[in-house]
Amino acid sequence: MQEIFIGEAIKRRRLELKLTQEKLCEGICEPITISRLENGRQSPSRNLVNALLERLDMPSDRYYALVSKDELEIEDLQAKIAYWDIRFEQTQDVQARVEAIKTHEALQRKMKLEDRISQQLILRSLAILGKEDGPFSPEEKQEMLFRAIRLTAPNFDVSHFEDGLYTANEIKIINQLALNYERLGDQSTAIDILHRLSAYMEQHCRCDRASKARQTMVLFNYANNLVSVGEYGRALLVAKKGRDICIECGHYLFFPELLAVMAEAESFLGNAKDSEELYKQAFYMAKAIGHERNAQMIFEQMKRRDE
């Protein structure tokens, strides 16, 4: 196996994409840091290296750098926050929120004050978890999400963001912004954001499982919004694409939901038999992967279509 310094790998990919050091590091570090990393004169934090690799769409698990015990603990805490966020979104379990907040506090004790990447992760998580007595209002959530994205993308503008470079967490924030515009009643902006975000991911996503999983998340939300405005043909095509990616990369988090969107679109298009079969697949897939709440929602949706 050929081995090269991580700085050399980053430099090769940056030049392949015709990116300047300034473009790559915007919002997360100084150009001099990139220069020193590429020349092997500096070993930045694991947090920063991961962010750079994500912006370059280079899977971080294929590249190795010396890391300290604290950096490994920070990475572990960040992964736990992501886990509790997903758990809370899927179940609305109060205990998941409690565990997430505890993990925020542990990460804050470990991270440096200037660690914008961890700050952003915590702020995004808080937007998901809401307050003790319920979710934030759409207006409050929008302010939090814009504040979060601009920690590392200071010039972010929702009307033309697709020329930027984004980490995994930044992509999730943009996706959340789109969903929040939907809750604010501005579905046209939500669909526009998801359309451009899906195009960005089509261009930048390589074949690694993690980035493909994020792509299925965006495609599901895009297709779901298209159904809501009556664009059933487009919704079906987008959802099929997401379904095929799930199968291709072996990641099934959004697989039941994509099948359910396809079922709903087929129903509105007058294809009752196809719709019924897809609803059954969606329901049993949700049950099989332990998504009981989603399985129940799919079942209720299927019953409404039969009435």
Task: List PLM regions with ranges.
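Helix-turn-helix repeat elements of alpha-solenoid scaffolds
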Residues: 89-108, 134-156, 186-200, 230-240, ...
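Short alpha-helical DNA-recognition segment
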Residues: 15-36
